[in-house]
């Protein structure tokens, strides 16, 4: 299938929405930074302009594929006439030694796209592979990432989390309120922060924006519960309580105290060794920055057939 047709089809996993972010713009920037103002001088100087080739993508490690659809967008941006065949799609498991894509067309075009395709795909597949491991261990809790992403690539990183079986936390500072320790300290306490936030959202017509409140101690958990139960305090936008760096026992106690009033989210000290036990506490979500800030790229190579 022509890359242009692949790129225009609906992806198996749509990227998270963002009001000012364009995947096409990110792809164009990645391609432009690679070729600069004179182009791919290696290919231009060694390969005749009309040379046609076939190349394949080879998995050199086992993991979860992510970046299949984005790679088609990259290839189409370089040369819409390239023909691509995908044997695996986003979210599929790929095995070490497996060829999972074939692209045919102008050799210069393939090589111009090569590094950008691999950079996106290796990082995304690394994130998806790690997310899959965490998500499987965390069940029945749902894994979330954080905003600890590569600047300029947040939607790409969060897209990979979706492909790996996780869910997205807030995309940025604009789509969810998180009242954390610094906000609480500056506002003069949890109650002041929540009331001020509810007032702000009401005055600006931001009824779709929800509030998450961080609690670091059981006393703070009880303070939030008291607010939720107080008929004189507006808390309709508060939908989640973050349990920050709490022990397993404290998380179990907090979940029991919350008793379904709002969702709960465990955060802090989340590793592949601890995430299963955290998931058994009854929390709704588990968030980990490691899914995007400590990931290892999945080893994938592109090879021209000879």
Please place each PLM-identified region on the residue numbering.
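Acidic/glycine-rich phosphate/pyrophosphate-binding loops and surrounding catalytic core
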Residues: 2-227, 249-257, 263-266, 272, ...
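Short, hinge-like loop/turn segments at secondary-structure boundaries
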Residues: 231, 283-284, 304-305
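A generic structural signal for short
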Residues: 243, 262-263
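Intrinsically disordered, low-complexity Ser/Thr- and acidic-rich flexible linkers and loops
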Residues: 229-237
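Short, charged, intrinsically disordered terminal tails
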Residues: 290-306
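Glycine/alanine-rich phosphate-binding loops at beta-alpha junctions
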Residues: 246
């Amino acid at each position: 299938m022509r890359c242009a047709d692949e790129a225009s089809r609906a992806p198996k996993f749509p990227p998270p929405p963002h009001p000012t972010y364009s995947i096409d713009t990110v792809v164009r920037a990645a391609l432009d930074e690679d070729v600069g103002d004179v182009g791919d001088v290696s290919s231009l100087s060694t390969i005749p302009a009309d040379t046609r080739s076939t190349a394949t993508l080879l998995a050199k490690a086992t993991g979860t594929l992510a970046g299949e659809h984005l790679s088609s967008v990259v290839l189409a941006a370089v040369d819409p006439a390239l023909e691509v065949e995908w044997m695996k799609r986003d979210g599929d498991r790929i095995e070490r030694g497996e060829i999972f894509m074939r692209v045919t067309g102008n050799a210069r075009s393939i090589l111009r796209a090569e590094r950008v395709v691999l950079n996106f795909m290796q990082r995304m597949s690394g994130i998806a592979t790690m997310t899959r491991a965490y998500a499987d261990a965390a069940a029945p809790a749902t894994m979330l990432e954080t905003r600890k992403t590569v600047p300029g690539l947040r939607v790409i990183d969060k897209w990979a989390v979706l492909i790996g079986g996780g869910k997205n936390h807030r995309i940025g500072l604009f789509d969810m309120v998180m009242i954390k320790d610094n906000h609480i300290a500056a506002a003069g306490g949890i109650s002041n922060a929540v009331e001020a936030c509810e007032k702000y959202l009401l005055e600006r017509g931001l009824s779709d924006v929800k509030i998450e409140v961080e609690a670091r101690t059981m006393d703070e958990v009880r303070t939030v519960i008291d607010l939720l139960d107080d008929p004189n305090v507006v808390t309709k936008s508060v939908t989640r309580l973050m349990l920050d760096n709490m022990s397993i026992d404290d998380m179990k106690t907090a979940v029991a105290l919350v008793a379904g009033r709002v969702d709960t989210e465990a955060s802090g000290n989340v590793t592949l060794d601890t995430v299963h036990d955290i998931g058994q506490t009854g929390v709704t979500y588990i968030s980990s920055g490691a899914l995007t800030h400590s990931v290892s790229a999945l080893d994938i190579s592109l090879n021209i057939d000879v």
